[in-house]
């Protein structure tokens, strides 16, 4: 149901253009269903034998894309194959899940050194996707890592220490005096939550956060591109640049609000029809859903996703092994 609805919405954002992205979307979805069916016949423990090979193939593909991939809108993210555009970073997400499941199935967290291997295997695809550049997908890799670490039993304090890295970076750029309070708090939590090698690992954690504090302003000024900075700033305040970087978000809100309770009907959205939102079929497809199906339509789709997530959690809980549960 979600796949078919998404095809209608993509077609709605590209009406009068003939067979466009919705057609490729539908074909890839049906091919994906077939692939899932055949993969479901393969025992996961057998698949585990090939995880290292799959990981190296994925890294090799990401390297190839960075040097010889197809460029669009200033980013080199795609491979062209038989008229279709394939984004290897999407497959890299699945690969990372498999690799992390294999690693975390064998580990029980007793000190922070057990995080090194999961962090390393996550870092390689993350950095290769980040330099394409694709900030959004690279952040997804971080979410996958944290989610799987949590599910595998990582202590809450460690999760906080990892997430605190982002706070350290923000403070370094916005309020450096706060670091004199923040970093000692992180050090105290590290010392309190570690069963072994407390002093050494606490010093390493404090050193790491101090390093993040030192390089964060440089990353913001020299590494992030202007459009990436705009996305991060305008996410909180799109009205700061209503005709520039904040235009998409503001128009999307208008489109969603104009849908009212029942919406204008599929393929009938006026803002969508008049192309008020450029490239609406990508990150802003939800605005077409809100305009054309209204509040009830967005509520239904949100409910379908909620049911899907609950079902996935149920499957993970009932899995026979930790490896299967993590996947």
Which residues does each predicted region cover?
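Hydrophobic alpha-helical transmembrane segments of multi-pass inner membrane proteins, especially
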Residues: 3-12, 16-243, 291-327
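Helical hairpin unit composed of two closely spaced alpha helices linked by a short loop
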Residues: 248-262, 266-327
């Amino acid at each position: 149901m979600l796949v078919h609805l998404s095809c209608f919405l993509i077609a709605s954002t590209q009406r009068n253009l003939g067979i466009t992205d919705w057609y490729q979307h539908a074909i890839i979805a049906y091919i994906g269903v077939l692939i899932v069916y055949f993969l479901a016949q393969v025992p996961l423990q057998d698949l585990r034998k090939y995880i290292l090979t799959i990981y190296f193939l994925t890294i090799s593909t990401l390297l190839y894309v960075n040097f010889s991939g197809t460029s669009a809108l200033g980013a080199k993210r795609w491979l062209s194959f038989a008229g279709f555009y394939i984004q290897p970073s999407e497959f890299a997400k699945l690969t990372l899940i498999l690799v992390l499941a294999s690693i975390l199935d064998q580990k029980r967290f007793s000190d922070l050194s057990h995080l090194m291997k999961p962090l390393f295997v996550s870092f390689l695809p993350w950095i290769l996707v980040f330099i394409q550049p694709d900030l959004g997908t690279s952040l997804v890799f971080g979410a996958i890592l944290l989610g799987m670490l949590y599910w595998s039993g990582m202590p809450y304090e460690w999760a906080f220490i990892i997430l605190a890295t982002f706070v350290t970076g923000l403070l370094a750029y916005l309020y450096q005096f706060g670091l004199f309070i923040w970093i000692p708090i992180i050090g105290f939590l590290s010392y309190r939550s570690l069963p072994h090698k407390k002093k050494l690992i606490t010093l390493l954690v404090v050193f790491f956060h101090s390093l993040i504090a030192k390089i964060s302003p440089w990353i913001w000024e020299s590494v992030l591109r202007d459009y990436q900075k705009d996305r991060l700033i305008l996410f909180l305040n799109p009205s700061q640049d209503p005709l520039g970087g904040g235009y998409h978000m503001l128009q999307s809100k208008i489109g969603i609000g104009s849908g009212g309770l029942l919406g204008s009907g599929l393929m009938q959205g006026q803002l969508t029809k008049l192309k008020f939102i450029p490239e609406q079929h990508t990150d802003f497809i939800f605005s077409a859903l809100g305009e054309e199906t209204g509040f009830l339509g967005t509520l239904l789709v949100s409910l379908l996703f909620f049911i899907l997530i609950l079902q996935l959690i149920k499957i993970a809980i009932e899995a026979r092994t930790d490896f299967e549960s993590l996947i």
